[in-house]
Design a protein with these regions (language model features):
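Short beta-strand-to-coil "C-cap" segments at the C-terminal boundary of structured domains/repeats
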Residues: 180-182, 351-358, 450-452
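Short strand-turn-strand beta-turns centered on an Asx-Gly dipeptide
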Residues: 60, 236, 402-404
């Protein structure tokens, strides 16, 4: 069974999913039109792709009226604006990458880079990184997910354009996982570099049907690839350089086993409710808030099933239910401060799941006492960030973030953290202090400062 975006455009009201006891689900923002993918920025903004070509920005819980950018796309079927990734050095270089179905000179998928100027793209900043092969009349199996790996290279999942033969051919980038430099170049250690030429040397793995999403695990660099099956099996594959995942010879586990192909680490059979594995994300944030047994788990979603489940690699890839009642989930992301975000296409919303143990749902109070909001701080200076925090059962720790990156944690009052101000001038930095209590409830204080 398959999903086609164009057939599923009936929006529902944004609402919270059903989550386990102790967890919370909150609507961050709604009003999105056919969203397809998202990326979390270090400063707390969320960039969301809309299939029709607009890249939207959610800032401080508000969907900004002006899109970050709008590209001209073919949005028929599963085509459109399908992927977004932030450069690893986004804080300093402000570079954002997108994957979209371009209309000229022929219909094909394109990877481009833009430069941010605040909450919009700098006019005229588009740089084309890669033009993918021209597409057939089939409008499905485009892939589109993009992430920078721990090696600093850009990984891009590309569908086989509904032509199974593409997946096994090294003469096309369709049906592949690609690996390229940030400028579209070929890393010298790519696995098929001596078997291909030109842009096909970016092929990193093959035998994929429609790899809709994938995720890297923080700390280990392990990659899981979610590959949408045809009629029977939805796959989670271990992303390993040079692998052939078997499509279209195999769907799910090869039967009989075939040593030429890498079987999935987990596959589930479609039923009357499920149709396509979509979002996927490892839970390894800098500051976890979920219970310890969730850390290292891989969360994944099914588009038609409307659920999120979790796979535990440390327990033999055992799978457990987690959240239900989501309207067409398409993407999952984990933030540095330990929230699990999901993108609900049917509801046009971004939600986040947090944890607050049963029995105590009173959040701490927290305030940043230094520096002052909107203060000017000297470049390359050492600033001590201080905060006060209190709670009905006691504060266990305060985490300090600058532009979404954890700087340090303090478990003893008065709570403080040292921060070295970077060199660029006229740069705005968001500082957050997040206080936790023993039940996992948390609250955040936010200020901003400018370096000069």
């Amino acid at each position: 069974m398959k999903f086609v975006f164009a057939l599923l455009l009936l929006a529902t009201t944004a609402h919270a999913a059903t989550v386990p006891t102790g967890f919370t689900d909150t609507v961050v923002a709604s009003g999105l039109n056919n969203p397809t993918a998202m990326a979390l920025a270090p400063d707390g903004r969320i960039f969301v792709c809309q299939q029709g070509g607009a890249l939207r920005v959610i800032k401080n819980g508000v969907l900004l009226a002006t899109p970050f950018l709008t590209v001209t796309v073919d949005s028929s079927g599963e085509r459109g604006l399908l992927g977004v990734a932030l450069d690893p050095n986004f804080v300093s270089n402000q570079l954002i990458y997108v994957y979209y179905t371009a209309t000229t000179p022929a219909i094909h998928n394109r990877i481009s880079r833009f430069t941010a100027s605040g909450d919009v793209a700098l006019a005229g900043s588009e740089t084309i990184i890669m033009e993918l092969p021209n597409l057939s009349t089939a409008t499905n199996h485009n892939g589109g997910a993009m992430h920078f790996g721990p090696d600093g290279n850009l990984y891009v999942a590309v569908g086989e354009n509904a032509n199974a033969a593409n997946a096994q051919s090294l003469s096309t980038r369709l049906g592949k996982m690609l690996r390229m430099t940030s400028t579209g170049g070929v890393p010298p250690d790519n696995p098929f570099i001596n078997q291909t030429t030109g842009a096909n040397q970016t092929i990193w793995a093959l035998g994929l049907r429609n790899p809709f999403t994938f995720s890297f695990q923080n700390g280990t660099g392990r990659m899981f690839i979610n590959d949408v099956g045809q009629n029977t099996w939805e796959e989670i594959n271990d992303g390993i350089a040079g692998s052939n995942y078997g499509w279209a010879i195999c769907e799910g586990f090869c039967n009989p086993p075939n040593p030429s192909f890498r079987d999935p680490i987990f596959a589930y059979m479609n039923d009357a409710q499920t149709c396509a594995i979509t979002g996927g994300a490892f839970y390894n944030p800098q500051a976890p808030q979920f219970p310890a047994n969730f850390v290292g788990n891989y969360f994944f979603a099914d588009f038609c099933g409307g659920w999120i489940r979790r796979l535990d690699p440390a327990a033999g890839n055992a799978v457990s239910d987690f959240a239900t009642g989501i309207s067409l989930p398409v993407d999952l992301q984990v933030s540095a401060d330990g929230f699990l975000y999901y993108l609900a296409r049917g509801a046009g919303s971004v939600n986040r799941i947090g944890f607050a143990a049963a029995g105590d749902n009173v959040a701490p109070t927290v305030a940043i006492t230094n520096p002052a909001n909107n203060a000017i701080v000297a470049r390359k200076s050492n600033v001590t960030i201080t905060a006060t925090a209190s709670d009905n059962v006691g504060v266990t720790r305060v985490d300090f973030f600058v532009n979404g990156t954890l700087q340090c944690s303090d478990t003893t009052a008065p709570y403080s953290c040292g921060w070295r101000v970077p060199n660029p001038m006229n740069r705005t930095y968001q500082i957050q202090a997040r206080a936790f209590d023993a039940a996992g409830n948390n609250a955040t204080a936010t200020i901003q400062v400018r370096a000069n």
